[in-house]
């Protein structure tokens, strides 16, 4: 979500002399309008438990982020027209970024691939492309497309997502012309801020909500939502997989999470999701990273 933020533990010692060889590496993929740094609290916990962690920045996210000049000035008229270098990026680019990191990490031991939100489509694509390099895959309140709902767009439009809060009314500019869904996270409008908080982290204090907003970026390519991300039974479908289900999610509604889990399990009846329920969690998960990290820790080889 090539810029890659590495947590700790990726050393250069010869493999034969490196006691870390064989440790599990967690490759963490961020969601829409986000960056690898989103994962820092969870990555810190996993590192302290003895794992290696790589927090992926997808192309033009995080360390490569594009910040519109008009966004800095809060000139909304100019912001509606300013061109974006993210236009034209798609799931092929996201898949390539994550696959490259997985290939490197797998040289040193087992890899657990985890995606949040839109990061789920990358998990599905990479899991389908290189299942032999993955020990486990995990979706954290993430899109898991199916043959019936093959894209993030299709998942979002499903009736089970009717309870979700849509950012459409907050969109700046024409997504078809700009090639990106552009949102203004620096808005001072109280109604817009209330909508964003409900969508992202309704259970967080306002101060924490503002911190979350500060880490988000304006642009996400529309092609990423529209790209097909359906795993095949013989590749993606044979990987052990886990779903972290968030019960107060207003971005990917809990009912939609349940449908995606059910459709995946029906597609691979001999290999079902291991589901862990967080009934009070909103879209970005609990404020305390420890409960999530504890579950991820159990996925290690």
Give the positions of each predicted feature.
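Conserved alpha/beta-hydrolase
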Residues: 47-81
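Conserved serine/cysteine hydrolase catalytic core
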Residues: 218-270, 274-281
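Conserved acidic catalytic loop of the alpha/beta-hydrolase fold
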Residues: 93-109
């Amino acid at each position: 979500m090539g810029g890659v933020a590495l947590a700790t533990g990726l050393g250069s010692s010869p493999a034969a002399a490196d006691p870390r060889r064989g440790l599990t590496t967690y490759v963490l993929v961020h969601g829409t309008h986000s960056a690898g740094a989103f994962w820092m609290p969870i990555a810190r916990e996993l590192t302290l438990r003895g794992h290696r962690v790589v927090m992926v920045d997808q192309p033009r996210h995080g360390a490569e982020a594009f910040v519109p000049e008009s966004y800095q000035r809060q000139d909304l008229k100019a912001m509606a027209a300013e061109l974006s270098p993210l236009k034209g990026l798609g799931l092929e680019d996201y898949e390539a970024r994550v696959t490259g990191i997985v290939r490197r990490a797998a040289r040193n031991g087992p890899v657990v691939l985890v995606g949040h939100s839109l990061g789920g489509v990358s998990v599905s694509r990479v899991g389908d492309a290189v299942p032999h390099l993955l020990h486990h895959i995990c979706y954290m309140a993430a899109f898991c497309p199916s043959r019936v709902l093959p894209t993030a767009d299709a998942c979002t439009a499903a009736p089970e997502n009717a309870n979700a809060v849509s950012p459409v009314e907050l969109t700046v500019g024409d997504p078809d012309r700009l090639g990106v869904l552009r949102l203004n996270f620096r808005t001072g409008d109280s109604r817009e801020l209330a909508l964003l908080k409900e969508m992202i982290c309704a259970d967080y204090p306002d101060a924490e909500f503002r911190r979350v907003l500060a880490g988000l970026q304006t642009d996400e390519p529309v092609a990423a939502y529209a790209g097909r991300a359906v795993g095949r039974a013989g590749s993606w479908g044979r990987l052990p997989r886990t779903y972290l289900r968030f019960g107060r999610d207003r971005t990917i509604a809990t009912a939609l999470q349940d449908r995606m889990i059910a459709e995946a399990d029906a597609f691979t009846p001999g290999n079902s999701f291991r589901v862990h329920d967080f009934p009070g969690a909103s879209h970005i998960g609990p404020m305390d990273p420890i409960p999530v990290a504890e579950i991820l820790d159990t996925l290690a080889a």
